[in-house]
UniProtKB/Swiss-Prot annotation:
Family named by the database record: Belongs to the class I-like SAM-binding methyltransferase superfamily. Cation-dependent O-methyltransferase family. CCoAMT subfamily.
The protein's name in its UniProt record: Probable caffeoyl-CoA O-methyltransferase 3
GO molecular function terms noted in the UniProt entry: caffeoyl-CoA O-methyltransferase activity; metal ion binding; S-adenosylmethionine-dependent methyltransferase activity
Protein's organism: Dictyostelium discoideum (Social amoeba)
Residues engaged in binding a divalent metal cation: D160, D186, N187
Organism lineage string: Eukaryota, Amoebozoa, Evosea, Eumycetozoa, Dictyostelia
Record InterPro entries: Cation-dep_OMT (IPR050362), SAM-dependent_MTases_sf (IPR029063), SAM_O-MeTrfase (IPR002935)
Amino acid sequence: MDSENFKQHLKKLYSVNNGKVKITNEIVKFTQNHSEPLHQVQKDLINYTNTNFESNSYMLTDGNQNQFFTLLLKVLNAKKAIDVGVYTGLSSLSFALSMPDDGKVTSIDCVRDYEECCHLHWKKANVDHKINLVIDNAKNHLQKLIDNGESGTFDFIFIDADKDSYDAYYELSLKLIRKGGIIAFDNILFFGATLVDHDSKKPEDQIFLGCPSFQRMVDALKLLNEKIANDERVIKTMLPLSDGITLVTKK
């Protein structure tokens, strides 16, 4: 091998996007196809959601995320998990499929709109007995778990719900997660909006600045991002996977 030519070639490659792969839909599909395959019922649930709840299907947990969580829960040997923000049940399904038969997922949502869809697919995958669907205010139920003596007993907690409450969920989850367990926050980049300043004049940023209710959620996420980044109680990492995920474990 011509080592000098090889080095020059690498320099040229590095000069394009600083040597990083630009994440396109083609790249995402490639990585999904070369990761642990989704269970057939996961695929069925994705299709069912896209067909029957098209207007809200953007709330589905990303396929790459589900593959990532499958591996993560296996590494953790997880037997107890909490899913805050259930929607049509895909994330809870993924967690239950990754657990042994005596594993338990506490799935919390504040609406019953998708309850039938959840149970339909959980039963189809033979994991319905592992999942306890709780229709309640998530902050209230997390506190109930603490009051019932379950602090420090959960292996994995996934937060994908109302962004205004993320900070409250964080503090409650820190009490519930065991040492060595992981708390995961979804949508931490929020379409890229958490990188945009309020006073930005860039044309491409204006789409993020025209809706007060959206901006309120963005502000809550920005505060949480800074809080976690500077929180000495935890070890943390933020990943640009899908809409952004932050993983946290207690020191």
